[in-house]
Amino acid sequence: MNYITKLCISLYCISIVSAQVSGIVVDAYSEQPIEGVNIISEDAGTSTDADGVFQLDVNERSILQFSHIGYHTINLTAINEMVVKLEEKVIDTEGIIVHAGLAEETLQRIASSVTVFTKRDIKENGSEHFQFLTDYIPNLNWAGGTSRPRYFQIRGVGERSHYFGEGPPNFSVAFVMDDIDLSGLGMAGIMHDIKQVEIFKGPQSSVYGPNAMAGLITLWSATPQDSFESNLTATYGSDNHYRLGLVGNAKIIRGLSIRVSGLKNYSDGFRENISKNTTNSNKRDELLLRTKLKYQPNEKLVLVGTAMIANLDNGYDAWAPDNNQDFKTYSNQQGQDSQKSTAFSLRANLGLSERMDLTSITSYSETDLVHSYDGDWADDTYWYNNHNFDPEVEGWSYEFFDSNEKNRSSLTQELRASIGSFIIGGYYKHLKEQDNASGYLFSGLVTEGKGIYDFNVLAGYAQYAYHFSSVLRLIGNFRYETNKIIYTGTYLGYDAALPPVKFDLEHGMLGFKGAFQYQDDNFTSYYLSFAQGYKSGGVNQQPFLAEKNRPFRPEYIQNVEMGFKKMMDNYSDRLTVFIGNRRNQQVSVSSQQVLGDPNSFYYFTSNTGSGQLGGLEWDHDHVITSNIRLTASLGYLDTKVEEFSYQMDSTTIGIGGNKAAAMAPKLTGSFGFDWRDESGLFARTDLTYKDNYYFSDSHNQISNSYFLINLSFGKTIDAATITFWARNIFDKRYAIRGFYFGLIPPDYPDELWLSYGDPRQIGLTFDYKL
């Protein structure tokens, strides 16, 4: 065989062994070409061009690996003219399970406007309390007037206070922690060992009843695991702030695990009291203890029990008669805003078959609340030096002190059966609240008051999901509930006992929701829903009120939502547009109780109002690179309380409404930038915005809009993390509550009085995980 023949045979063999393989890589769903796909074999590599095309010199029997950020990596055998389809990976939010509904669903598939904070989000935001998450939630606000947020507004609907005489403990926004209803008790929202926070916007009454007419806030603490775990966190910061937390998790026996956590938190409260020469009159002194047990003897039965003690021994000294922005106060009587809650819950899930499950949820809580304050906000020295008010000349000292002590106990039991796409259940609740108040009550008519509310709630509900096809389904649920309320009140005037009040009422309420959901692909969904929520009626406590004005009826809200959700490997978008209509709105009015008696006008709650609301909510999460993540949220809200009239005195008709709802900023938003690298270094900055809003429905005073900027950076070294953080780094002054009334003697002109949110605070946190 000559040389030429041998060379030709050799080249032919080489061409077989090392042939040029070509092909195109496209998106499996859209079939659009993908640029920049990495293609590697054992000894060669390339990437696709702008048209998704590639060429590679490999044997046709070689194994090629195709990888691209945002897509699943696959291995294929090389052939010529390949057509490779890559499937997108869903961003982590697809894996987020929302627990608060009647059935657990992924965040992408749930047909509601929901903001979710995972354990990672909570840690990155440095949130020690739910208070610090509120600025990142579109269309959520909270009213100051307490040491920690208790009263929330979602889409402009929600209470601003619950002083003695303001009615029963009915709330428009539910606050639930580990299946324990703490509505109106949001001070207990400490973020220690919390794994997830879920905020539902819009009526959720068909799931949670009358306390969820405007929305629902749920906090879930970490569940015990079989593995050993131990965590330590310690913080020191300005305002004499320190925080120490511990977590321990262990397996006791097979199927039984325990998790124990505890936290001590303290700060002085950012106030300098001139009268008492102290800096801790507004202190936050908080303790949280929690124990959780998980028992799973087999694959069918799971029991999770939670026991919790929250003891918040906080002071309250947040107002000043000179409205200064230096956080100086002059009160000579110590205020208190404390909450001690002892609670437990037990959730049992039993799987009877692949399609049938039974769930039982039991909870009990008992809470002691004290809210007291110096009613005139100053001492005699201040009033004399600044306003020439001399007690010896006037014959009386300008001193007022109000105190309200509450004890609330609540027992709930829920039973639920899930049969395929059908869910049916029942709910029982017994709540008892006792109030003891002293001070200038009911415009000075009462000096001491005692009230007892006794609630019995019974409800039944059902939900069904019908699948028209693999991509289109209809979800419908309803809840019918009866409330029986008994109120007993006794009162003392300045020189005699006043007429006692005893009244009971019962009413039924219906909530429902229907939603169409279209799943465009594995990553994109749309929904359209219509829902009705409700808030229970109640009994007015005013001792001289006519019997016909004693009760007030339930309030209803009807809501239409359209939503869009897209969740990919490197970004997620959730957009909701909504409109709502409030019916039988509960408002505070006054009426002449005895004809011809000009002194018989008393304020009470009545169903005389209506209102509208509309807007949008947007949440965005974008992983730019493996090191950089951007987050953003936006809320737009347009509200209106329709005009209504009420009797102010014997000759004057007052006009209310015809303006936006109180505590309802038109715009809320946030933007976050997070960076971290492989060495353990990290940094994060957040900007939040809140538009101006009316402080109250009873006057036209408004807040100022404001931006806040927070910053943190640090380093992780093995199991330890050190974080330096700063909140409100530009020391912005922003009001969280405003009252409009006459305070300054001798003429007592009406003025706007403001209480401010936290100033700048800096600190250092050390976390260690075993």
Predicted regions and their residues:
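Membrane-embedded beta-barrel scaffold of Gram-negative outer-membrane proteins
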Residues: 96, 347-351, 357-375, 519, ...
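Transmembrane beta-barrel wall of Gram-negative outer-membrane proteins
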Residues: 229-231, 236-267, 271, 275-314, ...
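Short acidic/polar hinge/loop motifs at secondary-structure boundaries
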Residues: 164-203
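Gram-negative outer-membrane beta-barrel transporters
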Residues: 467-470, 474, 483, 579-581, ...
